[in-house]
Amino acid sequence: GCAGCVISCPHDVIGYDHESGGYKPFHIEDELGPTDCGHGQKGCTSCTRACPRFRVWEPQANEHLFDRDRADDEVAGIYRSGYWDAVHTDILLTRASDDMVHQMGQDGGLVSAILIWAMEQGYIDGALTSYLEGGADSGSWKAIPGVATNRDEILAGAGSRYTYSANTLAYDEAVERGLSRLALVGMSCQSSIPPVMWSRKIGKVSKPILFNIGLLCSKTFDDSIFEELFEAKYG
């Protein structure tokens, strides 16, 4: 799960199982069951309004971001060449010009390069991203959410992840550290949280997220599957 409901809950009654076999939100007050968090009966709908897969979400996100829904021929979505320019332009194949950033990235280091530039220019003061548990040299496959506040921390989070990480869970840490201009790097389910929040009048939570980078994704894996795969292949 994207954890949009977790960071939006004003009553702190939604937790998140970020362990093998989990990766889903849950009610901390589990004795009340899945349909009653104790506050929902009183009219709180923050979690459902923050959920980017609840109700019709794509038109809502498009309306917030571009003031219109996309046309039938806009298969790749709505994109534009400038902030005020709604004219279609080419989709670009890019890579980082900094050799170190390029080498540390998975497919050219573009995301890392954008984050570094945005941070050095003062556009953002932190990024919600992911790291490998125990560090890049630990041999771990498990991805965990974290906050990057400088070039080294951004590069430490570069490269691919083969297990799920709800990067939005790093939001509370960022806010506690006093960061107020954030970038969010996440898969499509996570990157669709901020515009949906604004469209559904729960934008206060997503207000610090000024820069939203969505990564192409067809699926992701629970790290518990690797033990099964290795056992099946190598015995």
Regions found by a protein language model. Give the residues of each.
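Iron-sulfur cluster-binding cysteine motifs and their immediate structural context
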Residues: G4-F26, G40-D69
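Short alpha-helical segments and helix-capping/turn motifs at coil-helix boundaries
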Residues: P10, I28-T35, L110-W117
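Glycine-/proline-rich flexible loop or hinge segments
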Residues: G21-D36, L92-V101
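Short Fe-S-cluster ligation motifs
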Residues: I28-A50, Y83, M104
